[in-house]
Amino acid sequence: MVGRHGTRPTWRDAIDHDTLSGDRATPHTADATPVLRGERTIGNTAMGLGGLRGSMSDTFVVVGGDAAGMAAASKAKRDDPDLDVVVFEKGEWVSYGACGLPYYVKGEIQSLDHLVSVTPEEFREERDVDLRTGHEVVAIDPDDRTVTAESDDGEVVQSYDHLLIATGAAATVPPIAGTDREGVYTLGSMSDGKELREYVARARGGESLQQPDRGPACQYLETCTGPVGIVGGGYIGIEMAEALAANGFEVHLFQRGDAVLTGFSDATSEAVADHLREQDVVLYLDAEVEELAGEDEIEAVVTADDRVPVDMALLGTGVRPRTALAEDAGIEIGETGAIATDAYRETSAPDVYAAGDCAESTHVVTGEPAYVPLALTANRHGRAVGQTVAGTPTEGGGIAGTAAVKAFDVEAARTGLVGPRAARTAGFDPVTETITAKSRAGYYPEGGTVTVTLTADRDSGRLLGASLVSEYGEGAVHRSHAIVGAITEGATVADLENYDLAYAPPFNTTWDPVLVAAKVLSGTLR
């Protein structure tokens, strides 16, 4: 049991959350009868235990100024202007789009400022949020209801009535020799992005970075640059392979497993890998990196079979939740390694919430805790905490692990439990089918193909997961949205087969590839 709101929600409970329309929340319940969950009363104006407002001047403190933290701060202040909202952020940037950093390094986005959604000045002057940048929270005392923060001006102790931990995640540094050498980078923050962009500019001899209308091959550039190594074949690794290749670098990508994008289907991973090779990215699969070799600076990436000379290395081996602050405060850490919460994002400490990349979520398929650090989850859960603190208890909602990636001229998406292994681990008896179909009407002058992999439970027919891949612009990512809805609602493959999807020749075929995949899988299940 986490917090004071009962046991973890099932997948059905996880999706039974308030539906937002603008800034108003309309419960799914048909009347105004309160719905009891644990010890909190939902459905009327009275707050339960965790959200009880003690006065008209309660203080809401937020630790962390990115997506979840600033979404919570903004929503809480908007819904309750009398609330004192204080945000501590150890860096200088807040509310920025970290997902755009590879495109900044590439040169498609010209300024870091373009990644900032709302400036610190706007938060302070227009949203009336007491935002304190350059302040690192070093301790939380749930008993005294205080946080201690340090800055260049000294130490400050701030009391709170409600607290949100939104400390995010840090780039994972694998336990291999040489990660501290000069020329080894990660990409997890604005500062990281700035350093990488400066490296690219130096390597290019001051030549302007690649522009969106220029191709990835070195022949398009006046100055070609040396070899670089990328450790990891996930989202960051693949996006940065494109960014660096577009600027003339010879890219070597090392993946410990036998496929890139391991959370996707085999068909998707193979299609992406083939396209990377077409773009002259050198792939090393089943390649455990043993050392980043060199003296002071990196000189080579070393595996059991190869020693590849490089001028720079990027670690793209995932992220880990920043939980030290919560752990030191005695707050429960979940089995995934992230902060455990209930459906309302409240932790084991009263009136202390956690949201974003530092916290667990509930998977809509399994009903179990999951750690899937993605932007929409952080924004949604932060907003839910803001509403709860301001007086409207709001569940954060479950997640399906939906994600997308662009690799040069290919796009891919995934959602749910993809493939037999993930489904079987969760206790299902999986059946999987993969189809490839035209992305647009056959007579239409443009178009390509979409490959769709669907996984369902043999006994119930319930749709469990999907993976899609297509040429960039041919709709793999947008097609995934219908499947996400089906999975979230617990639909069967037969239900998906009967979805009334839009059709016009420039967009798809009469039988959209998603429907074709559902029909094929339905036939296998019968």
PLM regions: where:
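Beta1-alpha1 glycine-rich phosphate/pyrophosphate-binding loop at the start
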Residues: 48-130, 238, 242-263
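A Rossmann-like FAD-binding core segment of flavoenzymes
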Residues: 82-84, 131-153, 158, 246-341
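Glycine-rich Rossmann-fold phosphate-binding loop(s) that bind the pyrophosphate
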Residues: 64-68, 188, 231-234
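Rossmann-like dinucleotide-binding cores of NAD(P)H-dependent redox enzymes
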Residues: 225-229, 235-291, 374-377, 401-414, ...
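Flexible, glycine-rich terminal cap/loop adjacent to redox cofactors
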Residues: 63-67, 71, 75-84, 88-90, ...
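FAD-site-proximal beta/loop scaffold in flavoenzymes
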Residues: 180-222, 296-387, 482-485
